[in-house]
A protein has these predicted regions:
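A short, hydrophobic C-terminal helix/tail in secreted or cell-surface proteins
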Residues: 289-290, 295-301
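A short beta-strand micro-motif
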Residues: 27-31, 286, 304
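Residue-level detector of functionally pivotal "anchor" positions at catalytic/ligand-binding pockets or at interdomain
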Residues: 22, 266-292
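Sec/Tat signal peptide C-region and signal peptidase I cleavage site
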Residues: 14-20
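Sec-dependent N-terminal signal peptides
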Residues: 4-13
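Buried hydrophobic residues that stabilize the cores of well-folded domains
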Residues: 21-271
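Positively charged n-region of N-terminal signal peptides that target proteins for export
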Residues: 1-4, 317
């Protein structure tokens, strides 16, 4: 089950893959074991609904997340089967970046109040996420420190009580370097997802700052304190990507102790680049490489779409 959720994490982020020329968006992916995930988007190109269907041995599970957006927050509602039992995740935005989140889980045991998770995020001057503070109402406080190299997140170190518990080492497929392929896999989902509550709307929209330049090729786990780290070397995993003649990724192979293949279904979009923000300039639409629409070009690589449909890259130094 852990492996399946890791595969879900991988493929869910493919929905943010932007191809400004083909104008395609991921609508669905399915695994060879019969599991699937379906994506729906609002008129602005933001992820509005995500449905995950898990074909378990005994029963079929149906997980649903919905996302609503305002200028200062994102509200995610999640339920499994019964909408009466809904978990709520609220992201607080500052200048278009998530600064904190509060997750309230509906499940309560033994008459106790529903448990919660509080997240606080720290970024560097390049808008790269460098630290995550996770404070649950039960269990231990955890700090994740993130190390970047050449525009990619390469190391995540997990700390409890100032002692390192383990490391997540990330290697990337640098043969895939397409500015429109904004975010194929986001390792943040491994540490930000609690249960089945995955902050995909926040991630799809680039609300966690800088996105990654390349898709992940492999993940390796190093245990520093036994029985205190969620993963081990047995969870190491490698990914390979298959493209069609148009350059779209149509299949992903995830190899752990077993091999799982995931098929992707894409569809044309009618409103140009999938956007996550409204722009005030109707003449020229400006986007970051993550597909985030903005008022004006910013430092770094920008994607400019002109009224005639022409798309060009502009670098601001």
């Amino acid at each position: 089950m852990k492996k399946f959720y890791l595969a879900l994490v991988l493929l869910a982020l493919l929905a943010q893959s932007i191809d400004a020329q083909n104008k395609k968006r991921l609508l669905k992916f399915s695994t060879n074991s019969g599991n699937s995930r379906i994506f729906e988007y609002d008129k602005d190109g933001k992820l509005s609904k995500m449905q995950t269907i898990i074909q378990d041995v005994m029963d079929k599970e149906n997980h649903v997340s919905t996302f609503t957006y305002t200028a200062d927050k994102i509200v995610q509602s999640f339920y499994e089967g019964n909408p009466a039992n809904t978990d709520t995740r609220i992201a607080i935005l500052e200048n278009g970046i998530v600064k904190s989140e509060a997750l309230t889980c509906s499940y309560a045991k033994g008459g106790l109040p529903p448990y919660t998770y509080q997240y606080t995020y720290t970024y560097n001057n390049h808008k790269q996420l460098t630290e995550i503070l996770e404070v649950p109402s039960i269990f231990y406080t955890t700090i994740y420190k993130l190390t970047w190299a050449n525009s990619d997140l390469t190391l995540i170190t997990c700390y409890r009580e100032n002692e390192p518990m383990g490391e997540i080492h990330l290697d990337y497929d640098k043969t895939i370097d397409n500015p429109y392929l904004a975010l194929v896999f986001n390792p943040l989902t491994m540490i930000l997802s609690k249960g089945s509550v995955e902050p995909m709307g926040q991630l799809f929209g680039g609300y966690f700052g800088t996105v990654f330049k390349h898709p992940v090729k492999s993940i390796h786990y190093k245990v520093l304190k036994k029985d205190e780290f969620l993963w081990s070397a047995e969870d190491d995993i490698e990914f390979t990507y298959t493209k069609n003649a148009d350059g779209d990724i149509t299949e992903v192979t995830a190899t752990e102790q077993e091999t799982d293949k995931i098929t992707l279904e894409w569809s044309k979009v009618t409103n140009g680049i999938a956007t996550t923000r409204q722009a005030t300039n109707a003449a020229n639409a400006c986007y970051t490489i993550s597909g985030m629409r903005q008022k004006a070009p910013v430092k770094g690589l920008n994607i400019i779409k002109e009224p005639d449909g022409t798309v060009k890259k502009v670098i601001i130094r």
